[in-house]
Amino acid sequence: MDSNTITSFQVDCYLWHIRKLLSMRDMCDAPFDDRLRRDQKALKGRGSTLGLDLRVATMEGKKIVEDILKSETDENLKIAIASSPAPRYITDMSIEEISREWYMLMPRQKITGGLMVKMDQAIMDKRIILKANFSVLFDQLEALVSLRAFTDDGAMVAEISPIPSMPGHSTEDVKNAIGILIGGLEWNDNSIRASENIQRFAWGIRDENGGPPLPPKQKRYMARGIESEV
């Protein structure tokens, strides 16, 4: 196993521990807690894949970070902060919406590009809106936290979420996953519209009508993939 992979995991575990302490002391906001829950799942998945104990990895990560801080100067820290762009956090969904439990009568799911697409294909003839929470860097979607589909009456009918045990995903992965989701839901005569944030930061366009910015041919093509249930 590559030593850099182990070191990276150990440091990530310790930094997550520090962030958890902040959360326990009520020193952070809702997006911070949201990322904390997401990263906890990712670390558990990575730990299982690497065969490493999280507690031991956290202690080793602490030693690594402390050694680095001993040799770090304030001037170096200022330069590092100034040269690193900070991602923004976009929230279409409330805490209640992103943490809500939901059930499917006719479940379908597909894995694509490190993302899990789930939908209830029992849903028919509904008006559905797609909402997402994600980070943005350089005015483009950087990392998806969660995308969920809701009917007009608030029922949740579909979801796209990162798979913790798999490596990260790209903007194109998110686009493809949304295409699969839209195609699968439209197959049952549902009317889909994406939030303005999804359209702006995933596709870089604005649609005044809130319609999904995918050509019909692309949606039909990707909808075929939903037939292969995982």
Swiss-Prot record:
Q: Name the Gene Ontology molecular function terms of this record.
A: protein serine/threonine kinase inhibitor activity; RNA binding
Q: What is its main location?
A: host cell
**Where, subcellularly, is it found?**
Host nucleus; Host cytoplasm
The terms describing its cellular component in GO are: host cell cytoplasm; host cell nucleus
Renumbered to this chain, region (RNA-binding and homodimerization) spans 1-73
**Where is the motif Nuclear export signal annotated in this sequence?**
137-146
| Post-translational modifications | Upon interferon induction, ISGylated via host HERC5; this results in the impairment of NS1 interaction with RNA targets due to its inability to form homodimers and to interact with host EIF2AK2/PKR.
Q: Which keywords does this chain's UniProt record carry?
A: Eukaryotic host gene expression shutoff by virus, Host cytoplasm, Host gene expression shutoff by virus, Host mRNA suppression by virus, Host nucleus, Host-virus interaction, Inhibition of host innate immune response by virus, Inhibition of host interferon signaling pathway by virus, Inhibition of host PKR by virus, Inhibition of host pre-mRNA processing by virus, Inhibition of host RIG-I by virus, Inhibition of host RLR pathway by virus, Interferon antiviral system evasion, RNA-binding, Ubl conjugation, Viral immunoevasion
Coiled coil (residue ranges): none
- The answer on whether this UniProt entry bears the keyword Zinc reads no
Tell me, how does this one assemble? Homodimer. Interacts with host TRIM25 (via coiled coil); this interaction specifically inhibits TRIM25 multimerization and TRIM25-mediated RIGI CARD ubiquitination. Interacts with human EIF2AK2/PKR, CPSF4, IVNS1ABP and PABPN1.
Q: Which HAMAP family match?
A: INFV_NS1
Written domain comment of the UniProt record: The dsRNA-binding region is required for suppression of RNA silencing.
Protein name per its UniProtKB record: Non-structural protein 1
Species: Influenza A virus (strain A/Turkey/Canada/1963 H6N8)
